[in-house]
A protein has these predicted regions:
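Paired small-residue
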Residues: 107-116, 301-309
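A late C-terminal transmembrane helix in Major Facilitator Superfamily
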Residues: 332-364
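Helix-breaking motifs and short loop linkers at transmembrane-helix boundaries and internal kinks
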Residues: 49, 81, 102-108, 243, ...
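A membrane-interface helix-boundary motif in multi-pass transporters
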Residues: 164-179, 359-379
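Cytoplasmic helix-loop-helix junction between adjacent transmembrane helices
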Residues: 112-150
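Intracellular juxtamembrane helix-capping segments at the cytosolic ends
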Residues: 122-135, 316-330
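Extracytoplasmic gate region of multi-pass secondary transporters
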Residues: 38, 213-254, 261-264
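Helix-loop-helix hairpin linking two adjacent transmembrane segments in secondary transporters
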Residues: 137-138, 145-192
Length: 400
């Protein structure tokens, strides 16, 4: 049996530096670059930097960029190496923060928001493939949870760091985010491990992926569609839909951020102890119920509890899906290929869902509950795909 340096056990003290670098990358590229934009939207409009329509358009630029980055990540790493590509993408995100401090034009902003999204997609494809080969097999789930904890920290930070920065003005806010991104880029710079030499003789290059992998692609796509409404409309639902006001909406968003911090590590822990497939089934069932209850809940305690549960899902499902890829595809090189395709599937449905839910929200006269029920249906469909009759359907959806 051929062996690879990717399978060698690293000393415990050396494991945490790459994991920390991965956490910094997910925090900068997704946690801050995407989620810190949400609380900036009202300020961008009130300061007359851009119109309301332009602000939504600029937000979509990041999602489109994420899809492009997911497609370009592996070719970029092939030319630059994983480590250099990750470093470059973190520099790009940092530059985007600084550039957004200057409202030159809508085109200027769109270009930088697009670039930050491209960097986020590329990092999401490459970060686990760079770090996890240096982690013992029994701890890969927990390690991937720690890496993607950065997304949760960014969601939480969007509700705690941005408001104080906004008191200094929009330019200072963007510059502050850029300074934080620059610091995290510097701290992670020497934490990235050297690329491992992959030996792929254990699997033929043209060997087809197992059918269960395409099933996972379909599941991951519908998970993406299911997480969008709460991620985008939760605060508006509480503040305007329920008439509770912006303050209560902000408090519920903080609880969502708390869930986002808890999610990655706890879901990774589940993957290590229950296996990825059972964990995905459990998580999807809980999420479908929580989203259904969100559509009919009105008390603060219920909303806060549901926000924690639902908030754990966007960053938490990443290590679970990655663990499932590792269960289904033993060869390290093919794991990278499968994860890249899964990320593209996720990014595509997330972008499409974002536009579709926005259109439906406008067409329904701002009916938040309808969006949450549809998202619960998407999560339930993802769960159904994991059963025999669903597996046949999923292979028809995404198999080339």
């Amino acid at each position: 049996m051929p062996s690879s340096s990717a399978t060698l056990e690293s000393p415990p003290t050396s494991i945490w530096l790459p994991i920390f670098a991965g956490l910094c990358a997910s925090l900068v590229s997704i946690g801050l670059a995407r989620f810190a934009y949400t609380p900036l939207i009202p300020a961008l409009i009130e300061a007359r930097w851009f119109s309301a329509n332009d602000v939504v358009y600029l937000g979509a630029a990041n999602l489109v960029g994420y899809l492009i980055g997911a497609l370009l990540g592996r070719p970029m790493a092939h030319r630059l190496t994983n480590r250099n590509a990750l470093r470059l993408m973190m520099i790009v995100v940092t530059g985007a923060f600084f550039a957004c401090a200057f409202p030159v034009s809508v085109t200027w902003y769109f270009a930088w928001r697009l670039l930050s999204g491209i960097a986020g997609g590329a990092i999401m494809v490459l970060v686990a493939a760079t770090v996890l080969p240096h982690v013992p097999a029994a701890r890969k789930g927990l390690a991937s949870g720690a890496i993607f904890l950065g997304i949760g920290l960014g969601i939480a930070g969007s509700g705690t760091i941005v408001p104080p920065l906004l008191s200094l003005g929009l330019p200072a806010t963007w510059l502050g985010l850029g300074a934080l991104s620059l610091a995290l880029t510097g701290l992670s710079w020497f934490g990235w491990p050297r690329d491992t030499v992959q030996v792929t003789a254990s699997a033929a290059p043209d060997e087809p992926m197992p059918p269960a992998v395409f099933q996972l692609f379909a599941q991951y796509a519908f998970m993406a569609a299911g997480l969008v409404p709460a991620m985008v409309f939760l605060v508006d639902y509480v503040a305007r839909g329920l008439g509770a006001g912006a303050h209560v909406g902000a408090m519920v968003w903080v609880m969502y951020g708390l869930g986002a911090i808890i999610g990655p590590v706890s879901y990774g822990f589940l993957a290590d102890h229950l296996g990825a497939r059972k964990s995905i089934r459990l998580v999807l069932a809980v999420q479908a119920i929580a989203l259904g209850l969100l559509a009919v809940s009105h008390t603060f305690m219920a909303l806060a509890l549901l926000a924690v549960i639902i908030g754990s899902f966007p960053p938490g499902i990443v290590p679970l899906a990655l663990a499932r890829v590792h269960e289904l595809v033993p060869d390290p090189h093919r794991q990278q290929l499968a994860w890249s395709r899964a990320t593209v599937s996720f990014a595509t449905f997330q972008a499409l869902a974002g536009f579709a839910y926005s259109a439906l929200f406008n067409a329904s006269g701002g009916h938040h509950g309808l969006l949450f029920l549809i998202s619960a249906g998407a999560i339930l469909f993802a769960l159904m795909l994991d059963f025999p009759f669903g597996a046949e359907k999923s292979s028809k959806i995404l198999k080339p």
